[in-house]
Amino acid sequence: AYYTENSDTFVSQGLDREGEKKIDVRHILIQPENGVKDDDGNTTYSEEDWEAARVKAQQILDDWLAGEATEDTFAEAAAANSVDSSASNGGLYSNVSQGDMTDEFDAWCFDDSRQTGDYGLVRTRYGYHVMFFSGLSWYNTAKSALLSQKSNNFVDNAIGQFEMTYDLNKLAIAGVQLGNATE
């Protein structure tokens, strides 16, 4: 209902649930080590290098599954383990269209049976990817916007119901006294 009521806003952001399917996915990239570069700058890896990368990726997946196994803990694992630039964002690729990624990555993401919360390993020319399917972009964005709106409404209502007073001279941020605000 929220998406429908605000569809113009979402469509203007490229998040049309009736249009092209766009997804959000998290991943942890584990690259093989000890590659050899040829004259063209292409790196090749031995089967032992690929197997070592697969074992490391599988161990990361197993460790994640042995814990809470939530999207948040996956994001933490991505930040700690991925060599991809998305690691700083918890391994998140958002608003991905089919064809944006390698064929193998795309095939996993856009499999018709893919459901929010699915996970797995995918091998591409870049290495092994520990995958987590976050869901359809339009849905995730609408859900986030709705939660933000409800949170803002809650705070606004709370502020309206209770009188608040404050002394700027005693204002502190994160435990640091700011002193006299008029100085």
Residue ranges and their predicted role:
Residues 55, 59-104, 134-135:
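Peptidyl-prolyl cis-trans isomerase
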Residues 1-52, 79, 98-183:
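PPIase-associated folding chaperone regions across multiple families
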